[in-house]
Amino acid sequence: MSLISAAADVNDASSTTSAGSVRSSAVYRKDGKPLSQEALYRAQQKYGVFQSPARQTGSGLKDSKMASDVAANLANNNRTTIEAYKRVLDSNASRAATAVSSRSRSSSVTSNATVVTTSSKSTNAAVKALSSKPVEQPVAPKKSNMNMSKILVGAEAAAEKRIGIRMKPEKIVYVPSKESGKAAERSMSLTPEIMDKLKTKGDYEAEAEVEADPKKYASKAAFAVRDFDPNEATEKELLEREKKKQAYFGMLTSPQVLSLARANAQVKLDQIDKAAPGSLYKNEEFNKLAVALAQKNSTKRSEHHGKINMGGGLWLTQADVQNIAQGLITPVLDEVDSRALQQRAIDEDIKQRKIDFKEQNAAWIELQRNKLSNDKMYSRETRMRHKRETEGLHARTERKFQDLCASKDSEVAEMEKALQNAKDSYAALQKQMEEDLEKERLRVEAEVAALKKEQEEDLKAARVEQEQELKPYVDDVKAAEAEHERLTAERDSLNKEIEELRASIESHKVRIEELDNEISDSAAKHEEEEGKREELTKHKEEFDQEVSEKFTVIAQAAKEKAQKSSEEARLKQLEVDAMINERQSELNSTELELKKEKLSLLEAMRNVTELKGEDKLDENRVKALIGMTSEEFIAENNKSVNVSDDKFEPFNEHTASTKSIKHEEGVLGEGGAKTNSDELPVKDSAEKSSEHLNSTAEKSIEPAKASSPYPAKPSMVDAVLPKDFKPEVKPKAKPAHKTPQQGAAAGGEPASAKSGVKRSPSLKQKFMGIIKGDTKSQSKPAAAATPVHPPATVKKAAPKKAAASSEADTPAKVSPAKDTAKTEIQKIAQGGPAPAPEPEHKTAPAVDNATTKSVSTLQKPTNSGIDKSEIHKIAQGGPAPTSGHSNHTRTSVYENGDNSDDEDELPDSSEAGENGIGADKKGSLFKEVF
């Protein structure tokens, strides 16, 4: 709903009447129709001048009906400056008004009637007054004195009212509206200090109750006259007049004469008062003056008949006011109309955008549902394909293992025979050595007995000689004992320190014992590990040493060379794909820019046509500029929208990479097959190539994201959603249903999952020829497919440091090549399965959202699958064995139909291999890949 309804929609017959005219006038409208009641209400609400019964807001004029005329007059004057406030009331006005109002009527009459003369005849005025007769003299009519007390009282009341209004102005409560907040900000800011100073309605009511208390009238009156001085209120003129009056009274000789004079004067004054009303209308001069004045006033009134007094001597007719008002208000009303039309257009656009958003949201939900169904189908297909490949590989590995065991058993028998011969010779040699040792022992015992007897005789003679020589030394020993006692006391003092040191040593010993226990525990663990290792290498030490030191290294070198050549070929292939995708994206972006320019040109021409007031575009000119009419261009553009959305929609699903399954059991082989340490460099190179492929695919997809055509009218969804979010709207027509086999048999062109329409392969597919319609190969068992082995070139083996770095990337601890080979041979000897080769998956570039290609790449042979003769050939510089391997990869294309029977089916846990060994790790692998 717009803010202001159109004035044309309301049939309002109200009209305004001015003083002196009865006709209905056009209130600020060119077409003669007045404004609607809603428009007037909105305008009053916007500017805060709406008068409600609950709040009386004055317009500043006595007659509120003249407010519009005064506003028009002020607008005509166009006063851009506001004069500063000036105090028009004199500070002595209230004092003068009080003094005048206090004067009585009698004092003023007496003072006016009393005339003091200084002539020489004043002394005998009383005698003449008694003797003379009253003579009637013609008295000229005088104007009656104006009663100034009423005028001054009114002026004082008006002044007090104006002062009260200025001191306590009326508070204006603005009506809430869109502009009320801005107007309040422009006028003033209601800070907390100002809000505290403002009085509320309750404050005013409390003050009124206090003022209305009759007990406080006397105190208020006394407070009002606290500064009043009656002596200052009398004027100097009155004081001088009273002094002269008293001096005149003092000159009179008799009070009787004064009383008689007063009586005569009063009689004359009464006669004048009685005669004035009768002579007023009979006086001819008065009548002439009245007629002249009436004619003059009538002439002045006739000059401004039918005009409006604008104040300040300005009189305008109703037509002039209408012209001024139309010149000022019409642009505002036109702007209101234009904004109302714009608001209606915006409301309509919002409504249409909501409809478009709902449709696009429904399409996006449908797209997500199809994505989930495709994920289920792809996971089931991948699981079945892995099962087929694993069964064939297991059979071949068992056959090779049996042959290897037969050959190695014969070699072990020969080595055991040689070992028995060596043991026999060792026993004979040991017997001979025991006889020689017995003879030597008897000879040594005889020599020792003779030597012992001779030494005893020499010892007796030496003892006698020693006693004689030691006698002087005995005395020295006694002296030393005395010294020893002295040192004993010193030793006791040192023992205390020693005890303290021993306590510290004991604490260190406790810590040493703890460390010894830890060392013993670690030694026990080490011995346990050594026992396990010796158990594995008990009977086959010489054979394992030969394999680990010579044959394993040679086989690993050959494998590294083969893998390197394969990765180089893949790198070349990916570089070619990246170049093709880059050129395709540049071509698409150029076509998109051309369409945008054409579309902007059509938009500009349409705007020019609307401004000119024409209904249709100049199709001849449009055809001359862009080569086709506007309808043809729009139809072609809409057609290209669907094609571009289907063709360049990014496909982010990848098959299982080597990195994601290399540590999972139960995927390629049963019985817990483990990854060999010599395959780690191959995994690293495969991971690097997959990362390079992902980055290349992302670069080629980025221009395709922006390939959606520029819409003729911007949408709210385009402004809110990200640029790469362009959901495909599903067409209403139901497509023809196809099975994956039927789609693959239709010439190798993938069918769309949405519409079922065959789409031509992309430029990359045409150039490289990747898609091959080989549907028969998919129905064959997996055992028919032989593992691919790339040609190996004779190069230097990878350095040990690189191998160590690749082994360090694996999460599990990898033992040296020697221990690994021993462990695998021990498993083979115990009847376990041979370690299965690890498959490597390469993600092909996505062609369509519903089409994917799962490419099974090179299968790497294991150490157990290489014959000894082949290893000697590789060591001598010969070519790597290629028997049993093919030099090509197979590409399987799967298509998704709309009527797939297993869209909502969950993976069946009853399939073969699902509940076997490593089933839980298969589930985790499924979550990681999809």
Curated annotation (Swiss-Prot):
Q: Per the UniProt entry, what are the Gene Ontology biological process annotations, in alphabetical order?
A: eisosome assembly
Q: Which UniProt keywords apply?
A: Cell membrane, Membrane
UniProt main location, coarse: cytoplasm
Extract the InterPro entries matched here.
Answer: Eisosome1 (IPR024527)
User: Where in the sequence does UniProt note compositional bias of the Low complexity kind?
Assistant: 13-27, 98-129, 703-715, 740-755, 781-804
Localization in the cell: Cytoplasmic granule; Cell membrane
Membrane topology term reads: Peripheral membrane protein
Could you name the domain of life of the organism this protein comes from?
A: Eukaryota
Q: Which residue windows does the record flag with biased composition (Acidic residues)?
A: 898-908
Q: Where are the residues of the annotated region Disordered?
A: 1-34, 98-143, 516-544, 637-930
Q: Where is composition skewed (Polar residues) in this entry?
A: 849-866, 883-894
| Regions of compositional bias (Basic and acidic residues) in chain numbering | 523-542, 676-691, 721-731, 919-930
Output the Gene Ontology cellular-component terms: plasma membrane
Pfam families, per database record: Eisosome1
Cross-referenced PANTHER family, in alphabetical order?
A: EISOSOME PROTEIN 1 (PTHR28298:SF1)
Q: What does this protein do?
A: Required for normal formation of eisosomes, large cytoplasmic protein assemblies that localize to specialized domains on plasma membrane and mark the site of endocytosis.
Q: In its UniProt entry, what is this protein called?
A: Eisosome protein 1
* Gene it is expressed from: EIS1
